[in-house]
Amino acid sequence: MVKGIFITATGTDIGKTYITALIVKKLREFNINCGYYKAALSGAERIDGKLIAGDANYVYNIADIKGDPNDAVSYIFEQAVSPHLAAKLNNVEISMEKIKKDFSYIKNKHDYITVEGSGGIICPISMGKEKIMLENIIKSFKLPAIVVADAGLGTINSTILTLQYIKEKNISVKMILLNNYNHEDIIHIENKRYLSDNLPIPVYTCNKNSNNLEIPAEKLIEYYEEI
């Protein structure tokens, strides 16, 4: 049985792709066949006339996954806007059926699958014929989540609000990961202490520009669930 997890965040440009890549890299270095999938990607780069799914390409490079990164993304858009707006601008109808089919294909090639979200947890994927929010994908895949948050000022508010929204949607959260953490920054230190003391889930940190997660692979795989 394949096991999976979903990586979401408190907002855009928090570092989901960076953290996702480090998680997949850690597991693959532990000889675990871990793959990657993303339903919709915006802000793709066009090279020689072809759109390149930058987030997937980054994860594939860091985690040493073979193959075409574009195969790990169902919908790829050039405009750096929300997926629902990108789809509208390109006259594309996003389909949950295609997302499920593509996810199933990628999932069945691996023992573990790490799914990256788009933007923060409240992200419209499609407002066309099908109304699809990010949480619809998470629940459809039956995945627990990891929430990536910035370690700096304001993260207590954004993290707790994100967790409240996720709880309302009946999605399980396994841990919080504070990105861009500085062990000498009093704000970062206090944010971690407060969240650790007031949340029922573990709070981990990742130093800025780190090439490795300090979380052991054995601990990471405990957060993945059978899907």
Curated annotation (Swiss-Prot):
Belongs to the dethiobiotin synthetase family. The active site is at residue 38. It comes from Clostridium botulinum (strain 657 / Type Ba4). Its main location: cytoplasm. One of its GO terms (biological process) is biotin biosynthetic process. Mg(2+) binds at residues 17, 55, 116. This is ATP-dependent dethiobiotin synthetase BioD. The keyword Lipoprotein does not apply. GO terms for cellular component: cytosol. Substrate binds at residue 42. Its EC number is 6.3.3.3. It is found in: Cytoplasm. Pfam families: AAA_26. The lineage of its organism: Bacteria, Bacillati, Bacillota, Clostridia, Eubacteriales. Coiled coil: none annotated.
